[in-house]
Amino acid sequence: MTKNRTMKKEKKPKREVAIVHFNTPMLTEAAIKSLRKHGGEKYHVTIFDNSDMKPFNRRMRGVTVIDNTKGQVIDFEAELAKFPERDRSIGCAVGCEFGSAKHMMTVQKLWELLPEGFVLMESDVLLKQSIEEFFDTTQSVVGYWQKQQPYNPFHIGRMLPMLCYMNVPMLTAKGAKYFDPERTYGLLPGGRENRNNWYDTGSVLLEDILANRPNLIGRHIDIRNYLEHFGSGSWQNNVHMLHQEWLEKHKDLWQ
């Protein structure tokens, strides 16, 4: 007589979403709510908080906050000091000096802290639909391949950081990086004439993937179908009212 055996269900890979937060608590909270509303109820969210004025203090279920508001995890002053010839004409804005470089350093640290991989989601986006298909472990990345970044004099492309799955085990196995001290955004000697000073967020990642083909492959998705993006400069102190107006305009995506 044959005994009935219960088939074990295949365990789904962990769904991890990471947000780098910088002074936008209202937007970050709405971004998480939009994730929950569009199929991400059980996704775990990690917030890496680099704020110097408006930290993320909201307690939310399934959300872990890594507090770097005083440089506890990444000391940006010490990191920037490693680049004494950095050029403030690239990658600097009032209230956010070398923000892109700091963002890249943060995502590289997240590769260490979340070694199974994750979807990087910016704090100033609201989702329109589920992002389940981004979690494709057969790919090294899933996201939008911007072949040439606008206003980049060297036409360097990048994987847009607004919404991008990164298969960290696959990427690290082939030596890919998110931050590379030799390919940065404004940190190197030579200023605007140095091509290696024009690697914005996601540029090093894309270049390393292309250099490792076919060992590393990625999937291009038009993320415009998945999100509304507030736009650049959402972290600036003088746009609080614009945050409110934008969230009100798109309240159907997060409320």
Report residues per predicted region.
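N-proximal low-complexity "stem/linker" segments adjacent to membrane-targeting elements
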Residues: 2-33
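Short, charged/polar "capping" segments at the starts of alpha-helices
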Residues: 26-28, 52-58
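Short, acidic, metal-binding catalytic loop of nucleotide-sugar glycosyltransferases
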Residues: 34-42
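Short beta-strand/loop segment that forms part of the nucleotide-sugar
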Residues: 42-53, 67-71
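Active-site-proximal specificity loops/subdomain of glycosyltransferases
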Residues: 55-113
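Short beta-strand-to-loop acidic/aromatic patch adjacent to the donor-nucleotide binding site
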Residues: 116-126
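Conserved catalytic core of nucleotide-sugar-dependent glycosyltransferases
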Residues: 127-203
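Catalytic core and acceptor-binding pocket of nucleotide-sugar-dependent glycosyltransferases
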Residues: 172-246
